[in-house]
A protein has these predicted regions:
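Short, basic, low-complexity termini and linkers enriched in Ser/Thr/Gly/Pro
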Residues: 12-15, 21, 25, 217-224
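N-terminal secretory signal peptides that target proteins for export/translocation
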Residues: 1-10
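Bacterial signal peptide processing site
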Residues: 28-29
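Unchanged
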Residues: 98-122, 127-194
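Boundary at the C-terminal end of the N-terminal hydrophobic targeting segment
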Residues: 35-37
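N-terminal strand-loop-strand
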Residues: 46-92, 105, 120
Length: 224
């Protein structure tokens, strides 16, 4: 009986030793304990929460679309009436905030479609507007695109009350944000495209006849 007890005691001691060895081996092999695993999980969650909460302030980014439409005789520009603040009720170019998983051009095309239902085969990035006070909500940079398309029916959707084509001499006063400057710069840049007959201009003119192109050039004006 005593021999059996001693044997059992020796086995118990041996089991404890083996367990300790396994535990130590696990530590040396980098296997995390439960507490360490929980700490890693918390740290990961904190990192995800802080992903965009950097120490230094940083601006938001939007895109805007200056779209010129040709109806066969004249060139018009597409505007939307804003349905929310800031500048609620004012006219502006279709645009909005860039999403995390899209390029600037993808964002511009998405906003154009969401707010007006319009799609275009080609848009040209022409300027970034970065004045610190251009948006009363926060620091916002906007990347602007333009295109010339055949005028088609549009409809205000999403956060746009309505979408409408305006003749170049009938554009409403006091456009939202810095969009009056945006229109001026767009016309200056597109005039350069016309004067130099760039590949981008040729791309925009696909689908238009030579006669139509001449009318478009006359409407937009040759600016130095």
């Amino acid at each position: 009986m005593k021999r059996g007890v001693k044997r059992m005691n020796r086995l118990s001691v041996f089991g404890c030793v083996v367990g300790c060895v396994i535990q130590l081996a696990g530590c040396s092999m980098g296997v995390p304990s439960r507490a360490e695993a929980e700490e890693d999980s918390v740290n990961k969650m904190n990192m995800e929460e802080k992903m965009y909460a950097y120490k230094y302030p940083h601006p938001s980014v939007t895109t805007d679309n200056v779209i010129f439409g040709f109806d066969g005789n004249t060139v018009k520009v597409l505007l939307i009436e804003r349905g929310g603040e800031p500048y609620k009720g004012c006219w502006a170019f279709p645009g909005g905030f860039l999403e995390m998983d899209e390029s600037a051009e993808e964002g511009a095309r998405r906003e154009l479609m969401e707010e007006t239902g319009l799609t275009t085969p080609f848009v040209k990035q022409f300027h970034a507007f970065t004045a610190p006070d251009r948006d009363p909500r926060e620091r916002v940079l906007t990347i602007a695109y333009y295109s010339v398309v055949r005028l088609s029916e549009v409809k205000g959707m999403d956060d746009a009350r309505q979408a409408k084509w305006f003749a170049l001499d009938e554009i409403p006063e006091n456009l939202a944000f810095d969009h009056e400057e945006m229109l001026r710069v767009a016309r200056e840049e597109i005039s350069k495209e016309i004067r130099l007959n760039t590949k981008d201009w040729q791309e925009m003119m696909k689908g238009f006849s030579k006669e139509e192109e001449e009318k478009i050039v006359s409407e937009l004006g040759m600016r130095n």
